[in-house]
Amino acid sequence: LPRLCYNVRVSGTKDTGSHHISPGLPAMPEEEKPMKHFRFRTSCISLLLALAMLAASLCACAVPGEPTASQTDPSNTAVTSADASENNAETTPSCSLPELDYGGDEIVILSRYREGWTAGEIAVESILHEPVNDAVYERNKIVEDRLNIKIRSVEINCEGAVEIVEKMMTSVGGGSHEYDLVAAACYTVVDNSLTGNLRDLRKSAYLDFDKPWWSQGFNESIEYKGMQFAVTGAAVLSMYRFAFATLFNKRLFTEAKVDYLYDNVRNGTWTLDYQNSIVETFYRDNGNGLQDETGDIYGFVSNDYIGVDPYWSACNVRILERDENGDYTFDNFDAQKLQNVAEKVLQLFYGHGNASYDYKHYGNDAEQDDIRNMFAAGNAAMATLRIMALESAVMRDMKDEYGVVPMPKYDEAQKDYGTLLHDQFTVLSIPKTALDDRRDRISAVMEALCYTSYNIVRPAYYDVALRSKLVSDPDSAEMLDLLFSKVYIDAGVIYTGPLSGFHDQFRQLMGQKSNRVMSTYQKKARSTRSALQKNIVQKLQKLYDSGNA
């Protein structure tokens, strides 16, 4: 299985080949019981059988050991769910949690419920004989039994991203400890972490940050001088579902005599220039000379709001990196490179007459549904969408077959493809009202949840739902492996608020059809450096100096 964001280059690291960082965890107290390692051993042929066996194996001791997790070869696409379960059991490192018994204590998790986005990510009510739902249900039961706790999920039904953090802040401001764990949109939590409302997870006893069920990319992007206030990984499926990709309609490609995009990806020629070169090939007007949502066939459909975000990662444009001392730096930002990217994107969106269709942003990213619906209706040859669009009823009912590939590269000279996660992917944090012993208890729950998700929920979603049901061919399954192995997390994107919406400005310029990108960003450079120091570095340093996070 690909390890999403686990062994990829990320903003804030040097390209030295290995990008793991030390977990910096304190040694276990001597009075703790000896560690027992838990490994999954299953050769199931159905997910429900796997869940039953995994539930039993998690509660039993295995021989201590730390086998090295290996990356599945993306070219090996003929993988059944049974093969995946067996392979996962053989390669997953064991969990190093000691025996812990919390006497039936209740752990309260505050999270966001948005249907089609994050619903059911933290908890579900019952078994529905649906793989992902049932895997989440079984995961929570396993963790409850393993630690002798009760998980109480408090889900707030909201479309916006900020309500969860606001509710947590109200609780913290009142000095009450209502919530043990908060699961909320990344950029809102990262912004709030600078206020001192969250506990330093690196000081907790049981989080093993180096394990593959935690996102190493996120860790390396957000860690500061041994402090870290949020974490993400296999416990939350938005780490998969919010990744951007290019979808293409196989029927329209066949009719236009254009080869499917898979070989272009493999040989490195899937670039913005190539995408631009084929857009007009697919366009067919219904006869009225106008751009109609139905009736016309378009070469490309997207939008100039979050639809332009993925080009930061896809074209290897970095905002924040780290200097030789490990501090954030803006000095490597390349405004000329972004200008060049903008010219290619403007050409793709607006330079082909009526051949591209641009949905304008409205609501809480509601235009993404319009893009998906146009593509599913067979009215667009290519579309930029998040992976979660594949789960919708209209995509499942789509008459035409479709393929999935990564976002196009900047040019053929660029070595790797790059994948961006929509900045609302879920991260986990602990409110500062949790005292030290409580924080350690919550950290044990977090470690158990993420480890169990890695072995149960992730295969249910990735292998059973996504690779086996939602994509129709082994080529797309191979592309998904590649796509997820190239996720890049830039601190300049997830710190968007403190940086005064630096990456958001690109959306505005593309929406205005403006090619003044270089001059605009050169003017912003001074204020961005100031914002970096004042709004991020100085606040992090203050938290570090206080030593009481």
Question: Where in the sequence are the language-model features?
Answer:
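Extracytoplasmic "Venus flytrap"/periplasmic binding protein-like
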Residues: 146-223
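Conserved C-terminal helix/tail region of periplasmic/extracytoplasmic solute-binding proteins
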Residues: 431-443, 451-549
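Short, polar/charged alpha-helical segment
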Residues: 118-148, 246, 251
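Extracytoplasmic/periplasmic substrate-recognition and gating elements
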Residues: 395-466
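Glycine-centered hinge/linker elements that transmit conformational signals in sensory
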Residues: 276-279, 311-364
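Extracytoplasmic/periplasmic solute-binding protein
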Residues: 110, 115, 176-182, 186, ...
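Gram-positive cell-envelope targeting signals
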Residues: 1-87, 92, 143, 178-180, ...
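Short, well-ordered beta-strand elements
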Residues: 103-130, 149-154, 180-181
